[in-house]
């Protein structure tokens, strides 16, 4: 009988996961996790209460998803929306005031991939998570709407806004005839003129409207821009030319005059002869319009097809 009791006690010890030791409780589940546009895993242990948006393009995305923010990066070419009033302005998106940003003690900062990567080390040193997102394409914007709905605790609202956003863009794309027309997007800055390849707002909008960018696959695959060449432009001779700039409003034509408009070869281009040269406004094409992507599509479509209503 005694050996039996000893065996019984031993079995009970095993079933209770060890005599004299308490079971370790499992770690609490994270509130949210994802891999951002850089491939980095972001894990939020709880719902963020103080979200900072480093790009003005994120403001209308977060608003559409039903979320809120405490501070934001601004733009010299865009007025802050009414729902940004009372929030902390951290300066221009490309020149964020880090002292102000860290002073806000945010529990999540959302920035643009590429532009805000250099801020990662400073934020990490202050134990502030940084999520970097790309929002150049319609699919990236649609995903960003859902992400901002998730992190702000408005998952259903974000999913609904994302679905409506995609539905509107698809309807606009179907409305425009696919005539197999080709295009080139020329980007002008104060000291340089470039040809856009893929991954810019203008090239992605053109793709939605069935315009084939003749320089999409040229040059290094990882670059969005390539050096301008009149010779290359003459060889491709696209049906449409879109011009977009990063200069002071009102100076758009001036930046192109010497390199393009005053060149004899410019007048020989088919798009110039047929009157298919269009300037794209900075407020829609310089940086991502975010939730206003359909406005960029309507703008471009309306220039090429003025007889149609968008």
Each PLM stretch: what is its role?
Residues 20-31:
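Bacterial Sec signal peptide processing site at the extreme N-terminus
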Residues 15-18:
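C-terminal motif of bacterial Sec signal peptides marking the signal peptidase cleavage site
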Residues 2-8:
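Sec-dependent signal peptide recognition
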Residues 76-79, 195-224:
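Alpha-helical, coiled-coil/dimerization segments enriched in small aliphatic residues
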Residues 53-104, 108-113, 211-214:
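A short, structured surface patch at a secondary-structure boundary
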Residues 35-39, 88-99, 220-230:
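Short helix-initiation/N-cap motifs at beta->coil->alpha
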Residues 98-114, 128, 229-243:
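Proline-aspartate-enriched helix->loop->beta-strand connector
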Residues 31, 40-43, 118-194, 215-216, ...:
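Extracytoplasmic substrate-binding proteins
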């Amino acid at each position: 009988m005694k050996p039996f009791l000893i065996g019984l006690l031993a079995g009970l010890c095993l079933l209770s996961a060890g005599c004299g030791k308490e079971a370790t409780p499992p770690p609490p589940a994270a509130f949210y996790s994802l891999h951002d546009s850089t491939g980095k895993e972001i894990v939020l242990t709880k719902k963020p209460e103080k979200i900072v948006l480093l790009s003005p393009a994120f403001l209308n995305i977060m608003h559409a998803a039903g979320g809120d923010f405490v501070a934001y990066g601004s733009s010299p070419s865009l007025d802050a929306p009414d729902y940004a009033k009372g929030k902390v302005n951290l300066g221009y998106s490309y020149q964020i005031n880090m002292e102000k940003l860290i002073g806000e003690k945010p529990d999540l900062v959302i920035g643009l991939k590429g532009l805000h990567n250099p801020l990662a080390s400073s934020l990490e040193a202050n134990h502030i998570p940084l999520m970097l997102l790309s929002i150049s394409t319609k699919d990236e914007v649609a995903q960003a709407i859902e992400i901002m709905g998730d992190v702000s605790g408005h998952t259903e609202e974000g999913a609904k806004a994302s679905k409506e956003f995609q539905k509107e863009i698809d309807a606009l794309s179907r409305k425009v005839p696919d005539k197999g027309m080709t295009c080139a997007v020329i980007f002008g800055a104060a000291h340089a003129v470039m040809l856009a390849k893929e991954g810019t707002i203008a090239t992605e909008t053109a793709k939605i409207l069935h315009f084939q960018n003749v320089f999409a696959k040229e040059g290094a695959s990882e670059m969005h821009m390539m050096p301008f060449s009149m010779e290359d432009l003459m060889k491709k001779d696209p049906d449409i030319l879109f011009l977009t700039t990063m200069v002071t409003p009102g100076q758009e034509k001036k930046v192109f005059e010497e390199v393009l408009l005053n060149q004899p070869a410019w007048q020989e281009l088919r798009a110039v002869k047929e009157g298919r040269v269009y300037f794209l406004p900075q407020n829609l094409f310089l940086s991502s319009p975010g939730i206003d992507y359909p406005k960029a599509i309507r703008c471009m479509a309306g220039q090429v097809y003025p007889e149609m209503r968008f």
